[in-house]
């Protein structure tokens, strides 16, 4: 009987893992901006669970957090954290207008379907993450990016549920790559893409994070 119970629990856990929502970070670009700094762009494959779809359709606000870090490796001490920044989006549904609303900062966009809202959320574009005076041409840094559902912004009852329910665990792994500052001036190479400045860690120089 104990063996049967364990099998049932294992199958239930396996099913939960198979259907858990997730985010995958793809096509990262860290490129020079017109003002001499650097902007980050990436695509996110966001897999919503039915529980999250139901929650937002019933009026619960969901907050998504993109986090970016840039570190300078130091062989003699801990790595120096050069940049640690984030960007937040708020996803809501308004029953009166039957529209989904996606907000970040002062920007607000409305959509007729959840899929449309998620498509926009999945496209991270031209995020200013690094000033030109923080780095020197030819320097290399460890870069990392992830996106996740910020469960700390949920109402307390949902925060408690999120602790034990995988339906609320919506997050990517940290996507890490090696970023090398172009030797040419950022202003002269504003059209350059990440393929010239970003390399996945453990990949040959000049590659791109996928």
Q: Which sequence ranges carry the predicted segments?
A:
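Beta-strand-rich interaction surfaces with strong enrichment in secreted/lumenal proteins
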Residues: 27-30, 78, 130-133
């Amino acid at each position: 009987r104990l063996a049967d119970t364990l099998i049932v629990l294992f199958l239930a856990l396996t099913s939960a893992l198979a259907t858990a929502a997730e985010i995958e970070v793809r096509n990262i670009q860290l490129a020079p901006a017109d003002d001499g700094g650097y902007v980050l762009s990436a695509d996110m494959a966001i897999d919503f669970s039915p529980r999250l779809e139901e929650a937002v359709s019933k009026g619960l606000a969901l907050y998504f957090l993109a986090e970016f870090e840039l570190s300078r490796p130091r062989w003699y001490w801990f790595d120096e954290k050069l940049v640690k920044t984030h960007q937040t989006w708020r996803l809501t549904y308004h029953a009166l207008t039957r529209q989904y609303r996606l907000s970040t900062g002062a920007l607000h966009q409305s959509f007729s379907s959840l899929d449309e809202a998620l498509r926009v959320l999945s496209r991270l574009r031209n995020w200013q993450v690094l000033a030109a005076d923080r780095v020197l041409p030819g320097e290399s840094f460890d870069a990392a990016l992830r996106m996740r559902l910020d469960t700390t912004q949920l109402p307390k009852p949902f925060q408690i549920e999120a602790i034990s329910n995988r339906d609320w665990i919506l997050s990517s792994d940290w996507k890490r790559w090696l970023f090398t500052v172009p030797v040419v001036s950022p202003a002269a190479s504003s059209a350059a893409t990440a393929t010239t400045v970003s390399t996945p860690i453990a990949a040959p120089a000049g590659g791109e994070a996928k």
